Amino acid sequence: MMQNDLSVFNEYESEVRSYVRGFPTVFHQAKGYKLWDLDGKEYVDFFSGAGALNYGHNDENMKQKLLTYIQEDGVTHSLDMATKAKGEFIDAFQNIILKPRNMDYKIMFPGPTGANSVESALKLARKVTGRTNVVSFTNGFHGMTIGALSVTGNKFKRNGAGMPLSNTSTLPYDQFLKESNNSIEYIENFLDNGGSGLDKPAAFIVETVQGEGGLNAASSEWLRSIEKICRERDIKLILDDVQAGVGRTGTFFSFEPAGIKPDFVCLSKSIGGNGSPLAITLVAPEYDKFAPGEHNGTFRGNNFAFVTGTEALNYWKDDRLEKNVQEKSERITSFLDDMIKKHPEMKGVRKGRGFMQGIMSPIEDLADNIAGRCFEHGLIMETAGAEDEVFKLFPPITIDDEGLERGLSILQQAIEEVTAESNLVAK
């Protein structure tokens, strides 16, 4: 019988493993917002699989649908062939998500991960424009494959490529330019000035909230300005909603409050409902220009994820979940503001929006230490930002009041303990 012992992982698993170092236990069961390890210790999950478990662990309706599908010998693997499960997912996505929002997109299944979705959007934007350069933004994160890394800002991640990452240009995200806080004017000058050295891009790729980059949240005004820049210059707009989408910020798509219409939308993580690998790329019909098989892959048709993903879409047949997320988001915001006020020694700044919020502190290792103390007390939470300077709250969007308050209480305890023990010195 497996014991709560990490020796097999430490001895045989690659050194590249990361999350197990921050959460050093062997997990065994999970339900809703709770996890249990082999010792029976219970944890509140404010991590949600980095956004892959927006609906929590083992949602009962999704689980029963999947068990029935397996018991009936439903198709498991089918590449991009037509299956009943796939057809039902496409139909539900059209009728529950796209049509009520007056959105017109073709649905591409590029592979199982968010990076696959990003790669497909980059390739297609370059194909339809005939240009190679793509503009990304400071602190953006889009995946670990070469194309996705090329539009990622994090130096540590980029160095892992082992080769030059070319045909991309990085411009300042909203509020990155502290001195003027007007990155739009800066971006326009770079695009229009013949001496800037910036080749006309095929596309801009942007996140509305930079989940890995430090929970930087772009304003709706800034996003609308980015869309306007693209439209006026025949530049395609790729919206990476892999982490911020599927309800994480309150609305199904994180860009809905801004009222913009991207040319390509990248979705993965929670699109499969229960954490099963699935990615889709939404493509404006006029740019659906790949020839059959021009972008393919073995795992484009995860039927298990189609089954659970279809069931998950039922949450969006009315506005109850959306309103619930928005109400609980206000509770998270008020809690974080209260912690910043009570502990000025953190020099904290609240970041993000919706169910992806946190506190940034310039105090070295503070966010890491708070996340570590949370784990000791039974709360799973990670950090974000180029220097891991943000501790990041990512509860399931289906969490109830009891679960949310329990998690916030543990976090408050961790903040109080760490700030009391530490000699806090800003970086």
From Swiss-Prot:
A GO term for molecular function: diaminobutyrate-pyruvate transaminase activity
Pathway recorded for this protein: Amine and polyamine biosynthesis; ectoine biosynthesis; L-ectoine from L-aspartate 4-semialdehyde: step 1/3
GO BP field: ectoine biosynthetic process
KW Transferase (keyword) present: yes
EC code(s) of this entry: 2.6.1.76
Pfam families: Aminotran_3
Gene3D superfamilies registered for this protein in UniProt: Aspartate Aminotransferase, domain 1, Type I PLP-dependent aspartate aminotransferase-like (Major domain)
Cofactor: pyridoxal 5'-phosphate
Modification N6-(pyridoxal phosphate)lysine, positions: 269
Catalytic class of the enzyme: transferase
Keywords for the protein's UniProt record, in alphabetical order: Aminotransferase, Pyridoxal phosphate, Transferase
Family to which this protein belongs: Belongs to the class-III pyridoxal-phosphate-dependent aminotransferase family.
PANTHER family: DIAMINOBUTYRATE--2-OXOGLUTARATE AMINOTRANSFERASE, DIAMINOBUTYRATE--2-OXOGLUTARATE TRANSAMINASE
Protein name: Diaminobutyrate--2-oxoglutarate transaminase
Name of the coding gene: ectB
